[in-house]
Amino acid sequence: MTRGALAAGPLLLAGVGTGHTAPGVLAAIAAMLAGINDRPGSRRASVRRLGVPALAGALGLLAGTYAGQGLAAVPLTLVLTLLGLLAGGISAVGPVASAAGTHLLVGAAIGAGMPAAASGWQRALAFLAGAGWLLLLRLALPTPGSLAGHSRFDFRFDGERAAVAEVYDAIAALLDAVGGERATARRAALTAALDHAQDALAGPRLRRRAGSAAERRLHAQYVAALPLAEAATALFWAGEPVSVRAAEGPRRLAAAVRGNTGTGPLPAPHRSAPALRALDDALLRAAETFDRAEDAHQRPPARRRDVRHAVRAALGTGGREYGLRVALCFGASAAIAQALHHTRWYGQHQHWYWLPATAVFLVKPDLGPLASRVLCRAAGTVLGALVFAGLAALLPRPAGLIALVAVCGALVPVATRHFAALTAVVTVLVLALVMTGGEPQASVSRIGETLLACALVLVVGHLPMPGERGGGVRARLATAGSAAHAYLVHVLGESGDRAERWALRREAYRTLAEARTAIALAAAELPALARHTAGTDTVAVVLERLVDTTTACAVHLDETGRLTPRHVRQLRAALDELMLHGVEVPLPAAA
């Protein structure tokens, strides 16, 4: 909340105070959009999470400004439609790319639909300055609670430290739940914690290796958690409850990471089964790593994603389907907005950005099911517009509006927990910004445009598209199947490269989690849309069982050098069930 309060409001104040109101408004909008992407995590990861969408937004603003200045309505609509196709395809690559696609289109809508005297490059620089200001605050300010304990004088890595500690806590929670009803949910929580820590540690860097002792220590502590997570997953697969004492070691390691202290005494080993022996061995190795981590040069396994993967995702079935839908929504909304502009729906001013910008956020499937997005957007906009209409009649100008922008900026991080609340806060903030920039009070027309955008996106969302519906979900399932097969081949090949095995296991579980998220969103759609992905949840469950069994095989092979009949039987059962669902994951000859 502190970063939000110090972002948009002060930028707008600086612009108004220096007589550069229009650049101040753009900078504040950029800071607001960056604030929506500001999530808990490491400072290093925030550089990519905030910086890449900011660059895309500046590029969209640049393109939209020059296109709006030089093109008539029809060619401008075609250009914006092509941008929608590009941004939609890019959004299929991943979360950061999805945010970049959103910012690209919002920037283009503002550039074309909010004409200004400044040139395109001047507006783009103002946008970058606003997003850069929030990024600077993100890098410079400590997060709440980071100034306590032994790490209070070095809060640079508080996000990484919290993420790694959560991994050890998740391992302990899984061990507590083994053999119980909550075990599956705890295993999924462990995957999420490992994913979050991997992202926190793998942000952009100038040097190949960690430069400080504190960062090297965190890298080593994360790597030490991987065999612990592997052993805990093997125990989960076995399904037999373990003693309460088994979870004490990971909990003490979590406390040591969080407080940046030593591990202290660990519980005595309990070596009655191969998976328990693996857990005890991993715990002892982790304790040794904690003692000498500053001198270690271990790198966490990184995701093997390159430009070719991004291109395949953007041009694949999911990228094509999403790109066409975004292009149709964005192009149609821009055409309707320009038609309304020429009929003086907006009055005497030249701003028609609201309708296409609203359509961009509504067409994003990663913000929830379509019907839910539409209802939340409509309710949030109505509430926000009505609140702003009341406040605008009471607050002095421009001081009151600037204060309102600062308050809304502080509320954005809290409001991100619910799309309707976020919509209401952003509506008040944007209306205050553009009124400060000279646009008249337009709450009623904004409500009308939002409802029109909701209807448009609902219609387009149910239109048939070329190719198979649900392509994005099936593409993620196919990726998860390929990752599971690569992991299975490595384990049954009995390679001694554990780092490679851990990297493959991480990729298998991570792609499965991504597929699960996409399946859950698709299942929550209205029946007309949800039916296109029916049965995919069953495939994901079987793939998870296959990866869990592969992990149990890896641990058992390490301890005994051979598989039990139960391991082989479970592998064959999972592979046969996948075959029935049309997913082919061949069993290696080694089995």
PLM-predicted stretches and their roles:
Residues 1-9, 13, 124, 134-349, ...:
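Cytosolic regulatory and coupling regions of membrane transport/channel systems
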Residues 1-104, 108-135, 266-410, 414-424, ...:
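Alpha-helical transmembrane segments and their membrane-interface boundaries
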Residues 458-459:
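Cytochrome P450 heme-binding "Cys pocket" and the immediately downstream C-terminal segment
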Residues 453-455:
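A short glycine-rich beta-alpha junction/loop motif
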